[in-house]
Amino acid sequence: MNPPIAFAHRGARAHAPENTLPAFSLALRLGATGLESDVWMTADGVAVLDHDGVVRTGLRKKPMSEIMAKTLPQHIPTFDEFISSLDKTAHVSLDIKDLQAFEPVCRSAGDAGFPLDHLWLCHPDWQELANRRALEPDVRLVDSTRLAKISEGAERRAASLREAGIDCLNMHHSDWSGGLTTLVHRFDRLAFGWDMQFDQVLDNGFRMGLDGVYSDHVDRMMDSFVREIEPFSERF
């Protein structure tokens, strides 16, 4: 992608409480072009954004699937609240923690007028995503994994993703190299890298051709973007 997407991991979590509407808003003000979060379903079928998917009730912790949406702590946003607050130019990357969320998320985004080709749905089982490709042909699907888990090899995986209509391979930044991004691009798939927290890591990621990077530190990420991408980007 030109330019690559700069995803704020759980919003501007290095600067504000993670996965909250203020954190997401701050990330965009700091220049992030994408937002990342995790989506779960409540007991009454509401898609909500939270990392762990558990809620403390008294001395106990309950999974999100056992909690009614109206009883959630106020800081946990629903996906509807989140998506309706966004500028339509932003990108959104969601880790699908409950596969039941796939259709409601796509439907809510469409109802809000959010461009579905800016919605990136990530899951560690690419075949589960492939099974859902026909449900929503416009949404972006992302295979989130580690290189060590790709037993068939990166080239075979990239070919499988192309055949299945999965748009992107997302791995830890340490799994990527310039040669591997080139291989993935040869199959017309995109390459995303996560856990990119430091200047050198971000700079190297942009230089090797990653199409999307994820960082907690939006200020560092955007400084790196200015150094490595902005002078060559079609957007500027």
Question: Can you describe what each PLM-predicted range is?
Answer:
Residues 19:
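Active-site beta->alpha N-cap acidic-glycine motif
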